[in-house]
Structure formats: structure tokens, C-alpha cells
């Protein structure tokens, strides 16, 4: 059942190594390499989005890979929230991750 007022953030949305057709929804410049669920959860918590982690879910386009997902409060467009989460993760990872990007 779908939670009202929540957005689903799949790790593939933020993954720099994925193409747009594979599911990435933000630009490569703003994306991060191999985002982890705990990083997404922590970034969403810092942004005040009340994250809920569902670790045993699989992204429908790649149903054989169980990547998990994070539900966050719906405070605006999904792409804007995904970009904010990715930038927060970049900040948490430190300067070495942005130098590689």
C-alpha cells in the first residue's frame, strides 16, 4: 500500500554510474558513485525529510538486484529532493569524492 505524502528514493536515482534510461533522475554532475542506503537515510535526516528505510525492496527496472529504498516526506518535486540528498551525501563524503566527479 502506498504511503500518502511520501516519495520513494531509490539508490539508482542518485548513482553516477547509471544512465538516465537505467533510472538516474539527476545530472551526472550532481550524482554520486554507488550511493548506499545508510548514506541516503542520513542525508535525508539532515534535510529533515523523516526517512524510512526499506532494505529488502528491489528497483522494478532491475528487479534481480535488491538495492532497498528510502521513503521521505514529499516536500516538493522528486528531482529537487534527490539532488538535495545527493549534494548532502557529497558533503558527508568529503572533498575526495567531489574531486573524482
From Swiss-Prot:
Annotated gene: srp19
Keywords: Cytoplasm, Ribonucleoprotein, RNA-binding, Signal recognition particle
One of the Pfam families matching this protein, by short name: SRP19
Assembly, per entry: Part of the signal recognition particle protein translocation system, which is composed of SRP and FtsY. Archaeal SRP consists of a 7S RNA molecule of 300 nucleotides and two protein subunits: SRP54 and SRP19.
Family: Belongs to the SRP19 family.
InterPro entries with a match to the protein in the record: Signal_recog_particle_SRP19, SRP19-like_sf, SRP19_arc-type
This protein's name: Signal recognition particle 19 kDa protein
Protein role: Involved in targeting and insertion of nascent membrane proteins into the cytoplasmic membrane. Binds directly to 7S RNA and mediates binding of the 54 kDa subunit of the SRP.
